[in-house]
A protein has these predicted regions:
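Core structural elements
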Residues: 48-61, 79-92, 110-132
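Acidic, turn-prone loop/beta-hairpin segments
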Residues: 67-94, 126-219, 226-243, 247-249
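Conserved structural-core and active-site-/substrate-pathway-adjacent residues in large, well-folded domains
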Residues: 19, 53, 119-120, 165, ...
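Short helix-adjacent coil turns
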Residues: 100-107
Length: 253
């Protein structure tokens, strides 16, 4: 940007039109060791990135309205998928804190965004919708995924707070699950919200599960495009699995 060329993007205008957190997100997403570039297109992408993170919190908060400490499920009693996502968010917590400590803010926010897009939006949140919306309110299946959502909320709101400070505080003040702990997210500490896993999370097994899931979804999509079926609910899936795959499906399915 150059004042003489008249291509300067005013931070105050960005603040006024898009909000302080999107300005903060743009700054944090850029490697400060290299040239920082701003344009309407870059700020639009930053806004999209922000909305993805914010919408993730909206989903989580909306599905914890009837959840309290007495509803928590012990880790060993949780559904296997819910154990997996707890392991993933705990791993993210360690990685992001390490990146903050090394001032790698752009890598930290990238990891947070990718987690919201991939592990949550692309896998976990989509799978648990049936349990959240169709199971009995106090059923183990529903309380199990709510326990994991509660853990994700507690960790994720703290992870975004150094960058998306206003959003993190808004989330904190909105949620009784959070504001009952401290008056502000910035007065809270990172606690161990779930005991360290006593169960070995085999990443290779979960990788295979998701590969099988993707293959099934691809076949269903092809059948929808051919007008063989109208939607996934019209399909009956038979999986011809190897002995190893069958063992994994029985264990984690």
């Amino acid at each position: 940007q150059s004042k003489s060329l008249g291509n300067v993007v005013s931070p105050q205008k960005v603040w006024d039109s898009l909000g302080a957190d999107i300005l903060r997100l743009w700054v944090a997403s850029t490697d400060f060791r290299s040239e920082m570039v701003a344009s309407d297109e870059i700020l639009k992408r930053t806004s999209d990135q922000y909305r993805r993170i914010r919408n993730t919190f909206r989903f989580i908060l909306g599905n914890l309205s009837d959840f309290s400490d007495k509803d928590k499920v012990m880790f060993e009693d949780q559904v296997e998928l819910d154990k997996w996502i707890i392991n993933e968010i705990k791993t993210l917590q360690k990685e992001v804190i390490s990146l903050y400590e090394s001032f790698s803010y752009h890598k930290a926010i990238q990891k947070i965004h990718n987690f919201c897009v991939n592990e949550l939006g692309g896998v976990y949140l989509d799978i648990i919708k049936d349990r959240l919306y169709t199971c009995k309110n106090d059923s183990l299946a529903r309380r199990s995924c709510q326990t994991s959502l509660d853990c994700i909320l507690n960790i994720l709101v703290r992870l975004i707070s150094p960058i998306l400070s206003y959003t993190a505080e808004e989330i904190w003040q909105t949620s009784n699950r959070l504001n009952s702990q401290e008056d502000s997210v910035f007065l809270s500490n990172f606690d161990n919200f779930v005991e360290d896993s006593k169960s070995n999370i085999n990443q290779s097994e979960w990788k295979r599960i998701f590969e099988i899931k993707d293959a099934v979804n691809q076949t269903i999509e092809e059948m929808r495009n051919d007008n063989t079926i109208k939607g996934s609910l019209d399909s009956i899936v038979d999986i011809k699995a190897t002995a190893d795959d069958m063992s994994v499906l029985k264990k984690l399915g």
